[in-house]
Amino acid sequence: RRVGWLDIPLLCYCAALNDIDSFALTKADVLTGRDTVPVVTGYRLGEELLESLPFSVADMEAIEPVVEQWPGWDQVDETAMQPFIERLESATGIPVSILSTGKRRDEVCIFAPFQVEGEVA
């Protein structure tokens, strides 16, 4: 199975663009059993270290990801994933409100109940 690593600067950009106030983590079972999980925390542009996406196309083509190894988990539950979740929340400033722990609808942890705003389709 091919897996793309989490890109924190891109995630922050998308969250700001879409006014996201919390995350739902899904498919965490795909990475179960890894000691560490590679996470992009910034980009290198020549000698410069960037914490956010560059805006020029030329710079986008020239950047290299800066990858950190974050703690992995041996099972998908809120206790085992807590170090990863805390690090994600710290890096983005956005809380994780839902953790999907399996394929079934009842396999979910809700950390912060939320209200649906506006119309629901």
Regions found by a protein language model. Name each.
Residues R1-A121:
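Non-transmembrane, aqueous-exposed alpha-helical and coiled segments at domain scale
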